[in-house]
Regions:
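Cytochrome P450
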Residues: 1-155
Length: 155
């Protein structure tokens, strides 16, 4: 399945959850906020079962006003990434971590620690800006009826 189809499936799942929640709908919390992290999880090859934990640790790690929570989230995230990298080393999957591991053979150019840093960087750097763009896009659709209609006609 292509990345586009996998992302579309994630979006459909989140929109279904938004619909099930009924009014009032919280688009930000249900769709915009989780979507970027879930897509990065897809890119990294994180299993569906582990995604909620990974997303929670990412949120916890950013709790700068609660150092113990941030430290715990970061430690959990780091442990998980180490385990994931080790698992990917032998799995032969089609994801970014597997590609980085394959590129490092037979002469490792990247250490496991560097691969974990790259994965964490994608997770953190790819989150807040994308959430803001999704939220802004929804605001523009809600405030510009002609654009909303154009999207309905040609999704």
């Amino acid at each position: 399945m292509t990345l586009r189809l996998r992302v579309e499936a994630i979006v459909e799942e989140l929109l279904d959850e938004l619909d099930r929640g009924g009014p009032p709908a919280d688009f930000h919390a249900t769709v915009a906020f989780p979507l970027p992290a879930l897509v990065v999880c897809e890119l990294l090859g994180v299993s569906a079962e582990d995604r909620a934990d990974l997303c929670r640790w990412q949120v916890e790690a950013k709790q700068v006003s609660k150092p113990a929570v941030a430290r715990g989230g970061l430690q959990s995230l780091w442990r998980y990434l180490g385990t994931l990298i080790e698992r990917k080393r032998w799995a032969g999957d089609d994801d970014i971590i597997s590609d980085l591991l394959d590129a490092a053979e037979p002469d490792p150019k990247l250490t496991d620690d560097e691969i974990a840093h790259l994965a964490a960087g994608l997770l953190f750097a790819g989150h807040a800006p994308v959430v803001a763009i999704i939220d802004r896009g929804m605001l523009l659709l809600l405030t510009h009826a002609e654009q909303r209609e154009a999207l309905r006609r040609d999704p």
